[in-house]
């Protein structure tokens, strides 16, 4: 429960930057408030994911190389955490094919899930946490489940919520959220924690 509460605080802190930046994007690039609103929701979700997995930030960098490359070891010993990681990436697998036609195949969706979760795991070298192959496996599994859920909603799958969503927007949203979470969000987050504690 505390982790969810913590992720909510971190997401609110990120939204202080996401909302105005996305509004600027809307003016310069997206040119659709509907599209911008959907991207904001996706951005909030990504910020919560990064907060939950312990994404590094400029305030608390700690380089420590701890790697597990043997699959299924930690998964077996900590099944609850493995299940939570699966749940964490289900929305990722749902968002992508609904928003972007490029992710309508399971293969491209899994590649995207693998790329994003690998980036997160490599980034954890700078947090002192363990970079774990099991996390990559369960996160991709969660993304695939989300994809299958989206596939069941044939109307949403065959007709995107926003038809003018471009693949380049996916990279912009992901890179912007990672940039915000690393450089700016920690300062607002520390202020919020002082208020709530």
Where are these regions (language model features)?
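Bulky hydrophobic segments
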Residues: 1-122, 126-127, 151-197
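Membrane-interface catalytic loops of GT-C/OST-like multi-pass glycosylation enzymes that act
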Residues: 130-132
């Amino acid at each position: 429960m505390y982790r969810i509460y913590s992720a909510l605080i971190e997401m609110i802190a990120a939204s202080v930057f996401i909302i105005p930046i996305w509004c600027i994007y809307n003016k310069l690039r997206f040119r659709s408030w509907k599209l911008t609103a959907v991207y904001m929701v996706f951005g909030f979700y990504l910020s919560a994911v990064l907060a939950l997995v312990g994404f590094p930030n400029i305030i608390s960098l700690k380089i420590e190389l701890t790697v597990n490359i043997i699959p299924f070891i930690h998964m077996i010993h900590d099944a609850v955490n493995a299940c939570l990681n699966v749940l964490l990436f289900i929305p990722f697998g749902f968002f992508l094919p609904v928003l972007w036609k490029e992710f309508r195949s399971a293969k491209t969706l899994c590649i995207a899930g693998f790329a994003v979760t690998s980036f997160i795991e490599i980034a954890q070298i700078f947090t002192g946490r363990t970079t774990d192959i099991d996390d990559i496996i369960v996160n991709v599994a969660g993304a695939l489940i989300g994809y299958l859920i989206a596939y069941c909603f044939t109307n949403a799958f065959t007709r995107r919520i926003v038809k003018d969503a471009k693949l380049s927007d996916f990279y912009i949203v992901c890179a912007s959220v990672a940039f915000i979470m690393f450089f700016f969000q920690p300062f607002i987050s520390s202020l919020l924690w002082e208020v709530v504690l």
